């Protein structure tokens, strides 16, 4: 139940059943004026219907905010994360995690604009998203009041939730009276499916779960080869055609979809302490990660590459756990961005039945010296005898240890 007076609240609103119920609950339980924010993150569905639904629920026209944030999402969140080659627990490309800070930021901006004293979200009390949203809110507006309905209301079952919806004339799709087969989240970077039929980690996910990719075995028998250009660590062109960040990711998603690239079935460790199984599709991101590592392989020196690889798991955990606006993430970002100054050039990519292969790399800043590495007689002076002293110095501690152990 409501325990603090709230005059105006900004709700992250999708227009779906759950956030429509939350909207009405905020009005009835808090007596608050509700402001809705709906973001177009490239989730692949129309967002304008959210306006009509909010109006039907009694939200004033001036309190309905709908914004296309796809370019900002990719430019300021996805690309910075990919400069770090960010992967959580060796597999997850953080498609859901990276979207939450942007939504939280927009809610706080709107709250300041309209004079709202609270913000609200539709994340459940078991998942990571509640943490991500709220850490974002507090980092940007430390005294904001946060309403998390799933942790507050008294509904004991889904039936009770649907009864509330019917009582308040909230439209319910016919299939909502039964259990939905799984829960879906989507944006321009990925789609995720969790829960219900996917909760048993021993059971293979049904094919219909996959929305962003065709099955690899159904992909074309001929590989697709293209080029991806980079500047300062960010992709800027496909096949020589310059594109905006969101357009590039959209095109990579299309290429990945058509070639069965980017499917992932994993069990991850949630920040809140439990394990969860998810089926993820990140076609464009999977291609982008492989290509970025490809261009880094010829433009970064060994020390920089290895340090980045050491820092990456920490960076990934910060993003996954909701600390995007933390000083430590910004410190890591500064180091990563510094490393990308000369990460520029072109990568040739081959897609074939779910696989991404890097088959060529060129850069004006390449550190690869063909004359130095050739097995033929090189033009660069390299005395093979020098390696003997190098090996002996590196072996010194091993020899000392071996002598001690033989005593």
From Swiss-Prot:
Q: Which Pfam families match?
A: Arginosuc_syn_C, Arginosuc_synth
Q: From which source organism is this entry?
A: Caulobacter sp. (strain K31)
**Which GO terms label this protein's molecular function in UniProt?**
argininosuccinate synthase activity; ATP binding
Top-level taxon: Bacteria
One GO biological process term: L-arginine biosynthetic process
Q: In which pathway does it act?
A: Amino-acid biosynthesis; L-arginine biosynthesis; L-arginine from L-ornithine and carbamoyl phosphate: step 2/3
What name does this protein carry?
Argininosuccinate synthase
Localization, UniProt: Cytoplasm
């Amino acid at each position: 139940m409501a325990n603090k007076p709230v005059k105006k609240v900004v709700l992250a609103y999708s227009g779906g059943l759950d956030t429509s119920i939350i909207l009405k609950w905020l009005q009835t339980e808090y007596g608050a004026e509700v402001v809705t924010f709906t973001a177009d993150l490239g989730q692949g569905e129309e967002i304008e219907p959210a306006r009509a639904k909010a109006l039907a629920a009694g939200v004033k026209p001036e309190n309905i905010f709908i914004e296309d944030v796809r370019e900002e999402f990719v430019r300021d969140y996805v690309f910075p994360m990919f400069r770090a080659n960010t992967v959580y627990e060796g597999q997850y490309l953080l498609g859901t995690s990276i979207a939450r800070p942007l939504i939280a930021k927009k809610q706080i901006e709107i709250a300041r604009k309209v004079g709202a004293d609270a913000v609200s979200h539709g994340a459940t009390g078991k998942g990571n998203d509640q943490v991500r949203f709220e850490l974002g809110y507090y980092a940007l507006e430390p005294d904001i009041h946060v309403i998390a309905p799933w942790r507050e209301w008294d509904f004991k079952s889904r039936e009770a939730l649907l009864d509330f919806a019917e009582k308040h004339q909230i439209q319910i799709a016919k299939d909502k009276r039964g259990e939905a087969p799984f829960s879906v989240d989507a944006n321009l970077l990925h789609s995720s499916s969790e829960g219900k039929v996917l909760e048993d980690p021993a059971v293979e996910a049904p094919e219909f779960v996959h929305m962003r990719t065709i099955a690899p075995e159904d992909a074309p028998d001929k590989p697709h080869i293209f080029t991806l250009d980079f500047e300062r660590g960010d992709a800027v062109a496909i096949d020589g055609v310059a594109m905006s960040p969101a357009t590039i990711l959209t095109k990579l998603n299309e290429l990945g979809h058509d070639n069965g690239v980017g499917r992932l079935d994993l069990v991850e460790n949630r920040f809140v302490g439990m394990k969860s199984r998810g089926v993820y599709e990140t076609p464009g991101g999977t291609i982008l990660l492989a290509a970025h590592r490809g261009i880094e392989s010829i433009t970064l020196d060994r020390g920089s590459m290895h340090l980045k690889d050491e820092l990456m798991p920490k960076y990934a955990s910060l993003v996954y756990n909701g600390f995007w606006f933390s000083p430590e993430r910004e410190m890591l970002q500064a180091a990563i961005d510094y490393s990308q100054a000369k990460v520029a050039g072109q990568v040739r990519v081959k897609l074939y039945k779910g696989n991404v292969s890097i088959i060529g790399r060129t850069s004006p800043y390449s550190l690869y010296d063909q004359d130095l590495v050739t097995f033929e007689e090189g033009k660069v002076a390299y005395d093979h005898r020098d390696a003997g002293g190098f090996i002996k110095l590196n072996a010194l501690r091993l020899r000392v240890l071996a002598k001690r152990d033989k005593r």
